[in-house]
């Protein structure tokens, strides 16, 4: 799993050939925290 920012998003996601799963996460987001074990 990668942690991306504005500088690396285009290179790692938009320019990658193939499929990419992007998970948007926010600190303190209860549904986000509930999904983490499954996504990771």
From Swiss-Prot:
Q: Does the keyword DNA repair apply?
A: no
Annotated keywords: Disulfide bond, Electron transport, Redox-active center, Transport
Q: Entry's Pfam families?
A: Thioredoxin
Query: Which cysteines bridge via disulfide bonds?
Result: 29-32
- Tell me which PROSITE patterns the record gives: THIOREDOXIN_1
SUPFAM superfamilies with a match to the protein in the record: Thioredoxin-like
Q: Fetch the InterPro entries from UniProt.
A: Thioredoxin-like_sf, Thioredoxin_CS, Thioredoxin_domain
What is the protein's known function? Participates in various redox reactions through the reversible oxidation of its active center dithiol to a disulfide and catalyzes dithiol-disulfide exchange reactions.
> Which family does the UniProt entry place this protein in?
Belongs to the thioredoxin family.
Name of protein: Thioredoxin
Question: From which source organism is this entry?
Answer: Clostridium sporogenes
